[in-house]
Regions:
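Bacterial N-terminal signal peptides
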Residues: 10-19
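Carbohydrate-active catalytic/glycan-binding domains of CAZyme proteins
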Residues: 22-477
Length: 477
C-alpha cells in the first residue's frame, strides 16, 4: 500500500551482480522500476477536487486501451458526499499515473432511472466494435433485483455518448440480477455478455454484433453460482478473457462482501459458455460442494506484508492484454478506513499449466526478466491466500539459504531455481498435494510498503493456493 514512510527519490535501480556459475564471469543486471508517485491515503483535502483524486474513489474499474491511451470507467462513488452520477472516467499513458477525465454521461439515463430509481451508475464496461465504442452500465439500488443493464455508444472514447436504452432488465421477483456486465468476443468472433450478482449467480448471453444487445429473449446460461444458505449467493463482478496460448477461457469473479472480505477467484473452460472449473476440477456452478469457499481458485484476498497496514477487500476486476503482457485491474480498501476505495493495477503472469497468478505489488513499470540465482538467498516475507481466511492474510518470515535449504514460520525445506524465473519451494512437513510444493515466478517490483525496488514472487502450490513473496534483504556470503 502507499507507505507512511518516506518514498525513495525517483531513480532507476540497477543491481550489478556477479553471476556465479556464468561463463566468462559476466555480470547480470536486474532492472527495477522507478519510484512511482505515492497517493496519500485517506486524504480529506481532495474529497471535493476530482482532478486530484488520481486512484482515489475508484470502484469496479473496467479498462480499455485506445490510440489515445488507457481508460478506466468505474462506478460512481465518493467518500464524504454523494457522487455526480454518470460513470467516472480516468486516463493514463502508462498504467501508473491516472488523470481525471470526467463523467461519461450527464446523469442517469431516463429509462434506467424510471426502472430502478438508481442514484448512481455501477460497474461499467467498454468495448470497441466496428469503429464504435459501446459503454455498458448498471443501474440498481443496493440489495435490489429491480435492475437494468444499459448501453450508450460513441465514435470517441471521451464521448459524447448516445444512450441506446436497456440491454437486459430484471424485476424484484426475478431469480437473478441484471448488473455487472462484461462484454467479450470469443475466438470465433461471436460477442457475449456475462453478468450477474448474488441472487441467481452469473449468466452469459450471446449479443447481436450489429446492435450490441441480446440475440434472443431470456437471461442466458448460468455459469457460476454459490449456495444461498451458507454463502448468501455471494458471487459477482464477472470478467472473461481468452488465452490463445492455452486455448482456454478464464472466468474471473469476486466472492463475499465488498466492504469486508471481497476476494478474486478464477476458473477456466474450453468453451466460453462453460462449464468453468477451478484448479482442483470443481465446477463454478456446484452449490452442493462443501465447503463452498473452496470452489473457485482464489487469486487474491485481503493481505498484509510485515508491519504495513495492508489492504482489504480487493475485487471486481477487469483484465487488460497489452501486447504480450497481461494486467489485472481492481479496487481495494485500506485497512484503517474501508470507506475509501483505491485503484490497483498488477502484472498478471501465467503458470506453465495455464493458470493466471498476480504480482504481490502494484504495477510501477517493471518488466519480466531473467533473474540471477546469486541474489535469491536472503530474508523474504511469504504470504498464502488461504481460501479459508475471510479477512487479511498476513505474511510470515521465509529464509532462503545459500545451500539450497529454507527455513520459516511454515517449517523447513529446500529450494531450487531454474536459472531464469521459476523458483520451486518444497516443504518437508507437508503431504504431497497438500501444499508441499510451491512453484513461483520471480520478478522485479516496486515495494510500495517500504519504498524501493525489490524481488517478488507469485505462484500456486500443488493444492492450488496462491503464494506471494517479496525479498526484504539478501545474503551476500
Amino acid at each position: 500500500m502507499m507507505s507512511k514512510r518516506k518514498v525513495l527519490p525517483v531513480m532507476l535501480l540497477l543491481m550489478m551482480i556477479g553471476a556465479g556459475g556464468c561463463s566468462g564471469g559476466r555480470t547480470t543486471e536486474v532492472v527495477f522500476p522507478e519510484s512511482p508517485d505515492a497517493t496519500a491515503m485517506y486524504d480529506t483535502t481532495v474529497l471535493h477536487n476530482e482532478a486530484k483524486w488520481t486512484v482515489n474513489n475508484a470502484h469496479d474499474p473496467g479498462i480499455i486501451k485506445t490510440d489515445q491511451g488507457y481508460y478506466i470507467f468505474s462506478t460512481d462513488v465518493k467518500v464524504g458526499g454523494e457522487p455526480k452520477p454518470g460513470v467516472m472516467v480516468r486516463k493514463s499513458d502508462d498504467l501508473i499515473h491516472w488523470k481525471w477525465v470526467g463523467q461519461a454521461l450527464p446523469g442517469i439515463p431516463q429509462e434506467a432511472l424510471d426502472w430502478t430509481g438508481a442514484v448512481n451508475l455501477w460497474a461499467p464496461d467498454v468495448v470497441h466494435y466496428d469503429g464504435e465504442y459501446r459503454l455498458y452500465y448498471s443501474a440498481s439500488t443496493f440489495g435490489s433485483r429491480q435492475s437494468m443493464i444499459g448501453m450508450a455508444v460513441s465514435d470517441s472514447i471521451e464521448g459524447p455518448w448516445s444512450d441506446q436504452g436497456a440491454v437486459i432488465k430484471t424485476k424484484s421477483d426475478d431469480p437473478l440480477n441484471a448488473i455487472d456486465p462484461n462484454v467479450v468476443t470469443d475466438h470465433e468472433g461471436r460477442m457475449w455478455m456475462v453478468y450477474g450478482s448474488f441472487f441467481g449467480g452469473i449468466h452469459i448471453i450471446e449479443l447481436d454484433l450489429s446492435t450490441g444487445k441480446p440475440k434472443e429473449e431470456g437471461f442466458g446460461k448460468l455459469i457460476a453460482a454459490r449456495d444461498m444458505a451458507s454463502e448468501d449467493g455471494a458471487v459477482e463482478g464477472p470478467y472473461i478473457i481468452y488465452n490463445e496460448k492455452f486455448k482456454q477461457y478464464y472466468l474471473f469473479v469476486s466472492y463475499d462482501s465488498l466492504f469486508e472480505d471481497y476476494n478474486v477467484r478464477v476458473a477456466r473452460s474450453d468453451s466460453i459458455t462453460g462449464p468453468y472449473v477451478d484448479f482442483n476440477g470443481r465446477e463454478m456452478t456446484d452449490t452442493a460442494f462443501e465447503p463452498q469457499f473452496e470452489v473457485g481458485t482464489k487469486l487474491m484476498g485481503g493481505y498484509k506484508f510485515g508491519e504495513d497496514e495492508g489492504w482489504i477487500a480487493p475485487g471486481h476486476n477487469s483484465v487488460l492484454k497489452d501486447g504480450e503482457n497481461y494486467y489485472i485491474v481492481h479496487h481495494a480498501r485500506g485497512e484503517a478506513d474501508k470507506n475509501w476505495s483505491y485503484l490497483h493495477v498488477r502484472k498478471m503472469l501465467w503458470t506453465e499449466n495455464g493458470w493466471p497468478v498476480l504480482s504481490p505489488e502494484r504495477y510501477a513499470g517493471e518488466t519480466e526478466q531473467d533473474i540471477p540465482e546469486a541474489i535469491l538467498a536472503g530474508e523474504w516475507e511469504r504470504l498464502e491466500h488461504d481460501p479459508f481466511v475471510d479477512g487479511q492474510n498476513e505474511s510470515s518470515k521465509l529464509t532462503l539459504l545459500k545451500d539450497g535449504s529454507m527455513e520459516g514460520s511454515r517449517g523447513s525445506g529446500s529450494w531450487i531455481f531454474d536459472g531464469k524465473r521459476t523458483l520451486t519451494l518444497t516443504w518437508d512437513d507437508a503431504e504431497a498435494g497438500g501444499g508441499q510444493v510451491e512453484t513461483v515466478q520471480v520478478l522485479p517490483a516496486w515495494e510500495w510498503e517500504r519504498g524501493g525496488g525489490a524481488l517478488a514472487f507469485t505462484g500456486l502450490n500443488d493444492g492450488g493456493i496462491a503464494i506471494w513473496g517479496k525479498q526484504i534483504s539478501r545474503i551476500s556470503k
